Amino acid sequence: MQRTKEAVKASDGNLLGDPGRIPLSKRESIKWQRPRFTRQALMRCCLIKWILSSAAPQGSDSSDSELELSTVRHQPEGLDQLQAQTKFTKKELQSLYRGFKNECPTGLVDEDTFKLIYSQFFPQGDATTYAHFLFNAFDADGNGAIHFEDFVVGLSILLRGTVHEKLKWAFNLYDINKDGCITKEEMLAIMKSIYDMMGRHTYPILREDAPLEHVERFFQKMDRNQDGVVTIDEFLETCQKDENIMNSMQLFENVI
């Protein structure tokens, strides 16, 4: 039964409430399902917390409604266009932008700022390396800065995207050098960075070789032709057929 509880917790990413409240008769049959993203779930996201903590009180500021700010160096796209590109409502986009411009008046987030955000939310470990990888995943055009558009499009996929969209985004995160495939070295670097960020005071205590074991299991399932790399097709096909992998993918939502 302990294994079942852990599986439920992994599958919902702590977004569906306390698994202990699920009737015993139903726990064994629980399958992975798309999380229901409630307000509480959104508030568990580090980047959402960072932005909303800086958001000014709601008001009639017309600059928010049109996503305009004369002092910024980078002007974001219009509200209607961003709403069409994402799955956020106008009010959600306004709140996100309000916090974004308060924290980043230039309209851009650089990598040092991004690392600082994660160091604040994960003080028990070293979030520097993971923040670096995540920054590169959000920085869609690779120019060394995250625009508001990059920010909300990425969050929209992670929080409200389809399974296919989330998996493609995760593949891009793992594919560090962006050559279209994932190597064991790339996967190991990502896994080590996550373990480093979570710190040594996790429960249960993780062995030092845990990241390597995770990678080896990953490649045994993913690398269908045994050529030492995982392609996007192998990644998508295997993930969507393997419940355990899909469960583990949901854990990303706790460290975004």
Swiss-Prot record:
Highly expressed in brain. Isoform 1 or isoform 4 (T+ forms) are expressed at equal levels with isoform 2 or isoform 3 (T- forms). Primarily detected in the layer V and deep layer VI of the cerebral cortex, the hippocampus, and the entire cerebellum. Expressed at low levels in testis. Also expressed in heart. One of its GO terms (biological process) is response to pain. Residues 67-123, 126-161, 162-197, 210-245 form the EF-hand domain. It holds the Pfam family EF-hand_7. Residues 1-22 are annotated as: Disordered. Changing N14S: In strain: 129/Ola, BALB/c and FVB/NJ. The modification Phosphoserine is found at S60, S63. Keywords: Apoptosis, Calcium, Cell membrane, Cytoplasm, Endoplasmic reticulum, Golgi apparatus, Ion channel, Ion transport, Isopeptide bond, Lipoprotein, Membrane, Metal-binding, Nucleus, Palmitate, Phosphoprotein, Potassium, Potassium channel, Potassium transport, Repeat, Repressor, Transcription, Transcription regulation, Transport, Ubl conjugation, Voltage-gated channel. It is found in: Cytoplasm; Cell membrane; Endoplasmic reticulum; Golgi apparatus. Palmitoylated. Palmitoylation enhances association with the plasma membrane. Proteolytically cleaved by caspase-3. It is a lipid-anchor. Its main location: cytoplasm. One of its GO terms (molecular function) is core promoter sequence-specific DNA binding. Mice deficient for Csen show a significant decrease of amyloid-beta protein 40 and beta-amyloid protein 42, and display markedly reduced responses in models of acute thermal, mechanical, and visceral pain. Belongs to the recoverin family. Binds to DNA as a homomultimer. Dimerization is induced by binding to calcium. Interacts with the C-terminus of PSEN1 and PSEN2 and with PSEN2 CTF subunit. Associates with KCN1. Component of heteromultimeric potassium channels. Identified in potassium channel complexes containing KCND1, KCND2, KCND3, KCNIP1, KCNIP2, KCNIP3, KCNIP4, DPP6 and DPP10. Interacts with KCND2 and KCND3. This is Calsenilin. It comes from Mus musculus. The lineage of its organism: Eukaryota, Metazoa, Chordata, Craniata, Vertebrata.
